[in-house]
Regions:
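A domain-level signal for the structural core that forms small-molecule/cofactor-binding pockets
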Residues: 2-71
Length: 71
């Protein structure tokens, strides 16, 4: 299917540890929206940003659970 630019519905998904404030998440969503408009030609009215917050105990990096990390 060939969609016109204005008909596309971009979705940006951000996965991050739980703990950011609502103000931080709002600022992040604004920055992502601005970047998608500027660099990807997205229309703000069509852009979806989904923030998935994951508890540290449900995330691992390099074989170490997030709630066990020291850095």
């Amino acid at each position: 299917m060939n969609l016109d630019k204005e008909d596309r519905m971009p979705v940006v998904t951000v996965q991050m540890w739980t703990g950011r404030t609502q103000q931080q998440k709002r600022a992040l969503v604004r920055a992502i929206t601005d970047a998608m408009v500027q660099h990807a030609g997205a229309k703000p009215t069509n852009l979806h940003v989904i923030i998935q917050e994951v508890p540290k105990e449900n995330w691992a990096l390099a074989g170490v659970m997030g709630d066990e990390r020291k850095d």
